[in-house]
Amino acid sequence: MRITIIAVGKIKEKYLKEGINEYSKRLSRYCKLEIIEVEDEHAPDNLSSLEEQQVKKREAERVVKRLKEGTLLVVLDVRGSKMSSEELARKLESFFISGKSHVTFVIGGSLGIDKELLNMADFSLSLSDMTFPHQLTRLILLEQLYRSFKIINGEPYHR
């Protein structure tokens, strides 16, 4: 099983890097994990709606260039499907059972994800009704993927 996470922007905070490294290490027991960072666009607070769309489009173009053919594409979006940890585990398991051995998760930049990239997705996932910084989202996703593999394998961790 292969999981790729394509994330817009670099992680700057040490505590996030440490958490991401820890869960990446834990996940290596269950899957081949690759994390790809693509450059984010500078986005001042006072962008017009059109400028925001242009920023998201440029970021999406960078993401699309890194997608591998045949991967199942899961985009993280606030309007995506909301799931419990158990439901996410079953969804992930169903991807692998259906013959999809490579799943790619995309985390957009601070402005979100371009609608064309959303339309390309096989599945859209929301981690919460709350809004998180996109850097923190990477750590939360990794923890939930680790939790999912523990659930799938019937191993202790999930409570």
UniProtKB/Swiss-Prot annotation:
GO cellular component entries: cytoplasm
Binding site for S-adenosyl-L-methionine: L76, G108, L127, S128, D129, M130, T131, F132
Pfam families xrefs: SPOUT_MTase
Catalytic activity: pseudouridine(1915) in 23S rRNA + S-adenosyl-L-methionine = N(3)-methylpseudouridine(1915) in 23S rRNA + S-adenosyl-L-homocysteine + H(+)
GO molecular function, one term: rRNA (pseudouridine-N3-)-methyltransferase activity
EC code(s) of this entry: 2.1.1.177
Gene3D superfamilies: 3.40.1280.10
Alphabetic keyword roster: Cytoplasm, Methyltransferase, rRNA processing, S-adenosyl-L-methionine, Transferase
Intracellular or extracellular location(s): Cytoplasm
Record-linked InterPro entries: Alpha/beta_knot_MTases, RlmH-like, tRNA_m1G_MTases_N
Predominant subcellular localization, coarse grouping: cytoplasm
Similarity field: Belongs to the RNA methyltransferase RlmH family.
Subunit details: Homodimer.
Function: Specifically methylates the pseudouridine at position 1915 (m3Psi1915) in 23S rRNA.
Name of the protein this chain belongs to: Ribosomal RNA large subunit methyltransferase H
Source organism (scientific name): Acetivibrio thermocellus (strain ATCC 27405 / DSM 1237 / JCM 9322 / NBRC 103400 / NCIMB 10682 / NRRL B-4536 / VPI 7372) (Clostridium thermocellum)
